[in-house]
Amino acid sequence: MVALIIIVVLVLWICVSCIKIVPQAQAYVIERLGAYQSTWNVGFNLKIPFIDKVARKVNLKEQVADFPPQPVITKDNVTMRIDTVVFYQITDPKLFTYGVENPMMAIENLTATTLRNIIGDLELDQTLTSRETINTKMRAALDIATDPWGIKVNRVELKNIIPPAEIQNAMEKQMKAERE
């Protein structure tokens, strides 16, 4: 009798563990015996016990990556620090799961190198005044580069441009003189 109860409980547990409900704005990447099988979208799904495995739960909402200030050098050899924010969305859960080892680190490194390339073509004055142009160029470059990873870059913002202290002091003195 005890063995029958254990078997019934075990069978019920296996049946319940086969039912997976994927919540809104998420997708599950499924592997069968270690190989990619499919991507489950929102709703009710059944998995084969002991054979299918949820490899990754992927958030499909727009996400924000806030990176620490990056040192960059302008065309006129001024070193400044720029703080960036990247708004992105995962468009292909399979590519996101298998496309790159650590997507967040890859986006951070890609953002830093792209920022250095763009700022390296601009002088200090241009960098301080053409924030929108820099944002647009960065978004376009990052979106193309992250496409093979299943990521769409929606927006890039330069949160803060921090010039060197001596240049910042000179700018403050000039603004003070203009006000007087």
Predicted regions mapped to residue ranges:
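Aromatic-capped interface at the extracytoplasmic side
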Residues: 14-30
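Single-pass alpha-helical transmembrane signal-anchor segments
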Residues: 1-19
